[in-house]
Amino acid sequence: MIFGRREKRPALLTFDRILVPIAGTEADDAALRLTAILLAGTAGKAFLLHVIEIPFERQLDAQDPTAVAFADEALGHGEAFLTEHEVLVETGIAQARAAGAAIVDDAVERRADLIVMGLRYKRRFGGGWDAGRTVPYVMRNSTAPVWCRRAETEELAHTP
C-alpha cells in the first residue's frame, strides 16, 4: 500500500500583528489566551497597549506614577503569559482622553491585522448587559477587524 503525503494547505486565518488592549482586569486573560492561540508557532507579534485615561481637567502629559505602575504591572502580566506561550510581544503605554480613540490610532500606526479585546461582564442600571464605552467605539471606528472575548463569569444575564 502506498501512502501519499497530503499537500499542506495554507492556513485559513493568519495574523502578523495583533493589538491587544490591556486594562488590568480579568478580561485581559481571555484576550491573551485567544492571542496565544492565534500567534503560537508563528512569526506574528502581539502588541500589548495600556491606555491611561486623563480627565479633561488635567494636562494630557500630566504624570501619574500610580497609573504608570498599574500599567507596568498589567503589561508585565500579559507579556509573561504570551512569552510563556512562545509569542513575540511588544508593550506600550499611551495617555489619552479616551481609551477607544487611542486604541484605534495605535492599531493604524502599527498596521495591526487584528484587535483582540477582553470584555468584562457588566450590568447597567436596570439589569441589561453593558459593553461600556471603549469596546463599542473600537468596533465602530477601527479599520482592522475586532474580536472580543468576554471573560468568564458566575453571574448570569437574566433580563425581563
Task: Identify the residue ranges that each predicted region occupies.
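Short, well-ordered secondary-structure micro-motifs
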Residues: 31, 58-61, 102-104, 127-128, ...
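General small-molecule cofactor/ligand-binding pocket signal
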Residues: 47-49, 90-94, 147
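Glycine-rich, Arg-bearing micro-motifs that act as flexible, cationic patches
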Residues: 117-141, 155-158
